[in-house]
């Protein structure tokens, strides 16, 4: 009886599990626990018979003073725990690295050729393993590894090869490589200390470095591949269920249970719409490139709700860019009117869009990206009046160029109204989606509570817009726009014309601080109501708001973009910490 193997866990495996859990805990969902539990159960069921054979036939042996003596089918309890902790740690590494991925955008990849080639290679490897077992002796352990793990990899590849190929390679490679390197190190130390041994008559006798047999190198590599591919298969099933639900025209969207998702994956004939997947991919790329706060905020959400949000955010981004980048006032006005008409058509005849009645008679065709963005909107789960608010905000923007020298923001009330139209529309639309995706939550059921929370959400939206104005004083001045209330400017001895002439005037810092004060006040006044949102929404919503508030804090510290044309962007580490803090506070 000894504690050597236990000390390996206490020294290496358990601390790593603790660190990974601490890192991912704020973002952990019930679905994540279910995925990990599934892999742990499969690993135990698949490994115990195999490992029991290895121990009973003395392919693996343990020092008598290295284990405590408790066994399961002759397997030391420490070894059984190892299967659990390896699966847990590798799963967490995968979850951390792939949290930001929008899984449905990787659907639809046809990989028949790659599937056939991969399956052929795996069948060949299994055949080699069987031949090695027939030879026995020094080929025994090598053959046992290949013939045991090969069929699992073959099944995973046949079911999910297209999805595996479509996923980002870096995340998959790192998810496999990091745990493997760690376990190679732990295994080398343990073998050199004599905690366990691969017996000489059953191994090839080739060591890649001192104490590390080539079979052990292969074992840890192939088991981590099996774990990661197992998680990918589950994510494939979840992505299919998510895509099917998002494409449904039904207003109420309840995500099916975990086991139902897996069952439908095996039996369902659903094929994702390639056009929808392509539109989703473009929406994700657009947000990642032009709206980091919204993109990172969306990564905190999960499932169909996240997809609806991305499509909504993408529409706002497309419309805003088209208006801002118009060549002249008339072009911008045309874009706004086209957007208004297309929204009316989409909400009136979603099944006919974009060939709705009246659309084909338009004299000037709308930009294809605007049509695509509106066509992707989940209109059965949105309200037209919320999106119309954005249109009103665009019309306000036009007054700058329609009347040179005209500055529509005279008082704080004017800015409040504009912020309500532009940003509160986003918040109200988002909270409207919550009703459809969480129909059994008190927020959806209690109308009076919902009205209270939506009011608070709209104030949160105004918070974001105030910070945008404070951040973009110079950028707006470059296109002859001043969103600062004239009454505020006069108190500093300035006018809108002075802002256009010198957007870096030191006196504007007091106006900027006032904008940030207003943003912080609006945020503080609305934060308490956010606790009535579903847990799945509350943390991510606050994480998005807090990322904007952090931009405000950076502005107060004097942080500025490198050039006047750029937006102030927070370092990645800061954005991750803000998201972590907000999600941890929710937990």
UniProtKB/Swiss-Prot annotation:
Topology within the bilayer: Multi-pass membrane protein
Main location: membrane
GO biological process: carotenoid biosynthetic process
Gene Ontology annotations for the cellular component aspect, listed alphabetically: membrane
SUPFAM superfamilies: Terpenoid synthases
Pathway: Carotenoid biosynthesis; beta-carotene biosynthesis; Carotenoid biosynthesis; phytoene biosynthesis; all-trans-phytoene from geranylgeranyl diphosphate: step 1/1
Subcellular location: Membrane
Record region (Phytoene synthase): 243-587
InterPro entries found in the cross-reference section: Isoprenoid_synthase_dom_sf (IPR008949), Lycopene_cyclase_dom (IPR017825), Squ/phyt_synthse (IPR002060), Trans_IPPS_bact-type (IPR044843)
E.C. designation(s): 5.5.1.19, 2.5.1.32
Domain of life: Eukaryota
Catalytic reaction annotation: all-trans-lycopene = gamma-carotene; gamma-carotene = all-trans-beta-carotene; 2 (2E,6E,10E)-geranylgeranyl diphosphate = 15-cis-phytoene + 2 diphosphate
Alphabetized UniProt keyword annotations: Carotenoid biosynthesis, Isomerase, Membrane, Multifunctional enzyme, Transferase, Transmembrane, Transmembrane helix
Gene Ontology molecular function: any one: intramolecular lyase activity
Chain intervals for the UniProt region annotation (Lycopene beta-cyclase): 1-236
One matching Pfam family: SQS_PSY
Transmembrane segments: 5-25, 35-55, 65-85, 91-111, 116-136, 145-165, 218-238
Role noted for this protein: Bifunctional enzyme that catalyzes the reactions from geranylgeranyl diphosphate to phytoene (phytoene synthase) and lycopene to beta-carotene via the intermediate gamma-carotene (lycopene cyclase).
Family listed: In the N-terminal section; belongs to the lycopene beta-cyclase family. In the C-terminal section; belongs to the phytoene/squalene synthase family.
Name of the protein in question: Bifunctional lycopene cyclase/phytoene synthase
Lineage: Eukaryota, Fungi, Dikarya, Ascomycota, Pezizomycotina
């Amino acid at each position: 009886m000894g504690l050597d193997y236990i000390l390996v866990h206490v020294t290496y495996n358990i601390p790593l599990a603790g660190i990974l859990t601490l890192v991912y805990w704020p973002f952990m969902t019930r679905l994540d626990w279910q995925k990990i539990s599934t892999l742990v159960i499969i690993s135990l069921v698949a490994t115990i018979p195999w490992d029991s054979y290895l121990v009973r036939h003395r392919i693996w042996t343990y020092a008598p003073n290295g284990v405590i003596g408790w066994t399961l089918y002759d397997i030391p309890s420490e070894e059984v725990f190892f299967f659990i902790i390896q699966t847990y740690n590798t799963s967490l590494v995968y979850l951390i690295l792939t949290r930001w991925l929008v899984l449905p955008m990787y659907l639809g990849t046809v990989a028949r050729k790659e599937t056939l080639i991969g399956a052929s290679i795996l069948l060949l490897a299994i055949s080699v393993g069987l031949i090695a077992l027939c030879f026995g002796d020094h080929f025994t352990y090598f053959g046992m590894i290949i013939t045991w793990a090969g069929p699992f990899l073959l099944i995973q590849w046949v079911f999910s090869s297209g999805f595996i190929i479509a996923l980002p390679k870096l995340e998959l490679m790192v998810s496999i490589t990091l745990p493997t390197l760690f376990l190679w190190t732990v295994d080398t130390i343990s073998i050199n200390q004599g905690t366990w041994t691969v017996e000489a008559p059953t191994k090839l006798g080739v060591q890649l470095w001192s104490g590390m047999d080539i079979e052990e190198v292969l074992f840890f590599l192939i088991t981590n591949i099996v774990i990661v591919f197992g998680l990918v298969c589950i994510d494939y099933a979840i992505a299919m269920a998510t895509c099917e639900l998002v494409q449904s025209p039904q207003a109420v969207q309840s995500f099916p249970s975990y086991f139902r998702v897996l069952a439908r994956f095996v039996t369902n004939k659903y094929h994702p719409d390639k056009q929808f997947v392509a539109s989703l991919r473009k929406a994700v790329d657009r947000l990642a490139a032009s709206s980091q706060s919204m993109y990172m905020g969306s990564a905190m959400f999960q499932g169909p709700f996240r997809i609806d949000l991305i499509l909504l955010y993408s529409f706002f981004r497309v419309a805003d860019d088209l208006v801002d980048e118009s060549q002249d006032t008339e072009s911008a006005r045309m874009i706004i009117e086209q957007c208004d008409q297309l929204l009316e058509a989409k909400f009136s005849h979603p099944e006919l869009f974009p060939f709705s009645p009246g659309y084909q008679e338009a004299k000037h065709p709308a930009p294809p990206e605007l049509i695509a963005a509106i066509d992707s909107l989940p209109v059965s789960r949105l309200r037209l009046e919320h999106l119309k608010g954005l249109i009103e905000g665009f019309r306000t923007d036009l007054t700058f160029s329609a009347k040179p020298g005209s500055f529509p923001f005279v008082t704080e009330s004017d800015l409040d109204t504009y912020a309500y139209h532009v940003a509160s529309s986003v918040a109200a639309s988002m909270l409207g989606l919550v009703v459809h995706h969480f129909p059994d939550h008190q927020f959806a059921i209690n109308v009076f509570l919902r009205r209270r929370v939506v009011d608070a959400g709209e104030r949160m939206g105004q918070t974001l817009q105030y910070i945008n104005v404070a951040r973009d004083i110079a950028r707006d001045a470059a296109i002859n726009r001043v969103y600062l209330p004239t009454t505020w400017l006069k108190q500093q001895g300035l006018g809108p014309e002075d802002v256009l002439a010198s957007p870096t005037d030191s006196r504007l810092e007091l106006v900027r601080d006032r904008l940030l004060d207003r943003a912080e006040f609006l945020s503080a006044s609305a934060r308490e109501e956010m606790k009535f949102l579903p847990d799945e929404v509350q943390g991510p919503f606050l994480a998005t708001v807090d990322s904007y508030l952090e931009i405000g804090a950076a502005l107060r510290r004097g942080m500025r973009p490198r050039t006047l044309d750029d937006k102030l962007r927070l370092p990645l580490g800061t954005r991750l910490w803000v998201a972590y803090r907000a999600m941890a506070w929710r937990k």
